[in-house]
Amino acid sequence: MISLSALVKPKDGIHSVRLLEKSLRDHYENVPVRDHQYLVRFADGPALVTDELAGLRVDVVVSDERAASHFREALASEIATRVLGRTVDVVWSRSATVPAPLR
């Protein structure tokens, strides 16, 4: 299992990240976990979305490198579709620990 995190930060103001967050919640089934955090059910499984002050964090657990690559591509597509012309930076990292809501 691979635990991936994406930190999505705006280049031109926080509005682009807030737009992405709202769009994900409107478009996909989601369940609140706690304040500013919820699980979003993507086609490939759940992702933990956390609203942080400087951006949006998306955590996911995948089975292998192929699935990791697929999720990166899927999130990039979601961002391109939902943010529409606004620019954001996405920084990927891996973690040895899995966030509790994804266990």
Regions found by a protein language model. Name each.
Residues 38-45, 94-103:
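Polar/charged, Gly/Pro-rich intrinsically disordered segments
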Residues 3-7, 41, 89-91:
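Ser/Thr- (and often Asn-) enriched beta-sheet segments in non-cytosolic proteins
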Residues 63-99:
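C-terminal structural segments of small proteins and small subunits
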Residues 1-12, 16-24:
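Short glycine-/aliphatic-rich beta-strand segments at the starts of folded cytosolic domains
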Residues 19-37:
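Short, flexible N-terminal segments of the mature chain
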Residues 32-66:
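Short, intrinsically disordered low-complexity segments
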Residues 1-3, 53-55, 85:
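A general secondary-structure signal for short beta-strands and their flanking turns/coil
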Residues 16-18, 50, 68-70, 100:
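Short acidic, gly/pro-rich beta-turn/loop elements at beta-sheet edges
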